Structure formats: structure tokens, C-alpha cells
């Protein structure tokens, strides 16, 4: 397929769900762009963010490694986390490298582009904005929690999340990618802490909702403690629409395969329930299919099956990588 005719697919999110989908999509003959959240404030990313006043590198690192085409040993090196003791305690080598590159280059995007060359990534990676976001949550009792990593620990229902600074601008290249997209994919990933921080960037959300491209949400397979306890598939989409202020999701991919009980841990993690009636009321087309992977005993989306389902939504179905 010629370069000019490749469809443009934009995937928006963060956390551990997004890289899985990207591993499937990078095999396709498409222009692939990942727009990644910068609200992480925990672990190695949180330490670097606080000490260096830079974007948290963790989600960006994971996305870049998912799109990479290098020896698996290089990936293992970038994912290596130092042991608990010492000054480097808990830090991930890839986070340190990306942070160092941000100091050596004019911008964080320049640093990403340099690392993209080193890792031979297929696609483009763009942080949602050029400054770290503080994610806050208003809980059901009216209390306010400051910080992405603290929100799921409260054991309370979340009424809403909001960001600081409130009027932060998205990266211009992220907005441009959405404008040019033939397909916009949201998720999978933690609803409140990985998905919504991107959609709370007003200008980016406006471009997404105004786009004529198909907008697809990949529903999580499992609920998440402290975020989506007892949520149905329709509940996820309701929350997204409420935060953005309008209905805009056209379709959603929903796994139908039962997760083996022995993989449902801790005990209060559950499989997301289906609510077809409510989904129909939302006007969202639900695509029910076996999207489950349990490789290595972990519950994930099956990357290739998800990629195939997404690419089937494009007018040109001849998208296999040659």
C-alpha cells in the first residue's frame, strides 16, 4: 500500500492497556499515532517528575517499547527496575534514559523522537501535553483527593476527576493527529487515571468530538479496585461522556470470553458486566467478541484480535503489513 493511502489511526490512553493494543496495531499498514497521558505521579515516574520537573516518563516508555522493533534484550534492559535499596531504588532504566534525553534536547518531544530512532519504533508517540498534569478527584462524600496515584486508594466512589492546571493546552501535534485521523481509539486502561486525563484537555476533547472519524472505546475486561468497582461496560462510556460534556463514542469493543476464576485476583476484582440495553440507549454500537488473552497468567486484551476488529472499521481493509 502506498504511503499516501495508509489510513491514520490515533490511539489515546496510558497505563498498561494501551501498549497491548499498540503491539497489534504496529503490525498493520497504517499511520499509527499514540497520544499518551502525563498525569502519572507514582513510582519511578513520580520521583523523576518531582525531582526533575519533567513529564513523567513511565507511560511514554511503555508505549515506545510496545512499538519498538529491537532485540527483546534491549526491551528487557529498558524495563529493568533497580532493587529496593540504594539511591536508584525503584527506578526503571528506560525512565532515566528518557529523562536524560529530555535534558540533552530542546523539548520532550525531541527526546522522544531521538529514542524512537534508537528503538526503531513503528508509529509516532506524542505526550498529551508538554507539562505534567495533577489529577484530582472529587469523591462521593465531597472530599478532594490530589494526585493520580492516591485516587484508587480511597475506597470510595469517584464523582468526577479534574486536572490542574485547568486550562493547559495539548501538544499541537496531538491536536493535528486527531484532526487528520481516520479512526480514533480510546483505551483500554484505567478509566479515571489513564483515559480521562487526556480527555480533560479541552482543546483535544473538542477535536475528538468534532472529528468525522469513527471513535471507538475499548472496554476494559476487568473492573479496577478504587476506580470502577461494579461498573458495567455501559457505565464506563457514561463516565467518559459526562466528563467530556457530550456523547461522541460511536462503537465499543467488548470481550465476551469468561476470565478463569483463578486469574481474578485480588478477590474483589471482577469481570466487567454487559449491559446491552443501556448501551443501546447510549447510541453506541457494541462489538461483542472474544478479545481475551491469558498468556503468562495475566488478563489482557488479545492484541491481534483487537487490531483486526479496529482495522475492519476502516474503508480500506487491505491493511496487513507487507
Curated annotation (Swiss-Prot):
Cysteine disulfide partners in this protein: none
GO biological process, one term: regulation of cell shape
Keywords of this entry: Cytoplasm
GO cellular component, one term: cytoplasm
Keyword Signal: no
CDD domains named in the record: YvcK_like
Main location: cytoplasm
Similarity comment: family membership: Belongs to the gluconeogenesis factor family.
Name of the protein in its database record: Gluconeogenesis factor
Species of origin: Listeria innocua serovar 6a (strain ATCC BAA-680 / CLIP 11262)
Amino acid at each position: 500500500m502506498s504511503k499516501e493511502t495508509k489510513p491514520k489511526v490515533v490511539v489515546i490512553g496510558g497505563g498498561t492497556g494501551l501498549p497491548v493494543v499498540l503491539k497489534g496495531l504496529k503490525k498493520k499498514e497504517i499511520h499509527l499515532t499514540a497520544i499518551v497521558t502525563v498525569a502519572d505521579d507514582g513510582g519511578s515516574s513520580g520521583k523523576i517528575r518531582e525531582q526533575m520537573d519533567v513529564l513523567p516518563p513511565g507511560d511514554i516508555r511503555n508505549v515506545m517499547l510496545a512499538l519498538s522493533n529491537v532485540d527483546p534484550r534491549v526491551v528487557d534492559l529498558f524495563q529493568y527496575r533497580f532493587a529496593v535499596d540504594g539511591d536508584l531504588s525503584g527506578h526503571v532504566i528506560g525512565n532515566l534514559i528518557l529523562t536524560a534525553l529530555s535534558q540533552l534536547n530542546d523539548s520532550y518531544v525531541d527526546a522522544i523522537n531521538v529514542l524512537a530512532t534508537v528503538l526503531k519504533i513503528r508509529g509516532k508517540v506524542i505526550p498529551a501535553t508538554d507539562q505534567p498534569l495533577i489529577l484530582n478527584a472529587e469523591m462521593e462524600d465531597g472530599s478532594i483527593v490530589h494526585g493520580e496515584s492516591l485516587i484508587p486508594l480511597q475506597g470510595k466512589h469517584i464523582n468526577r476527576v479534574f486536572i490542574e492546571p485547568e486550562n493547559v493546552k495539548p501538544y499541537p501535534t496531538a491536536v493535528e493527529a486527531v484532526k487528520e485521523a481516520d479512526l480514533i481509539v480510546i483505551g483500554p486502561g484505567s478509566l479515571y487515571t489513564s483515559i480521562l486525563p487526556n480527555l480533560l484537555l479541552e482543546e483535544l476533547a473538542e477535536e475528538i468530538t468534532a472529528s468525522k472519524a469513527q471513535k471507538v472505546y475499548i472496554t476494559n475486561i476487568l473492573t479496577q479496585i478504587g476506580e470502577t468497582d461494579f461498573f458495567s461496560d455501559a457505565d464506563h462510556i457514561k463516565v467518559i461522556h459526562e466528563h467530556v460534556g457530550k456523547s461522541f463514542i460511536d462503537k465499543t469493543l467488548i470481550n465476551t470470553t469468561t476470565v478463569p476464576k483463578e486469574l481474578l485476583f485480588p478477590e474483589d476484582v471482577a469481570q466487567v458486566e454487559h449491559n446491552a440495553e443501556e448501551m443501546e440507549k447510549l447510541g453506541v454500537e457494541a462489538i461483542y467478541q472474544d478479545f481475551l488473552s491469558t498468556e503468562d497468567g495475566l488478563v489482557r486484551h488479545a492484541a491481534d484480535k483487537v487490531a483486526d476488529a479496529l482495522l475492519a472499521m476502516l474503508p480500506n481493509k487491505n491493511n496487513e503489513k507487507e
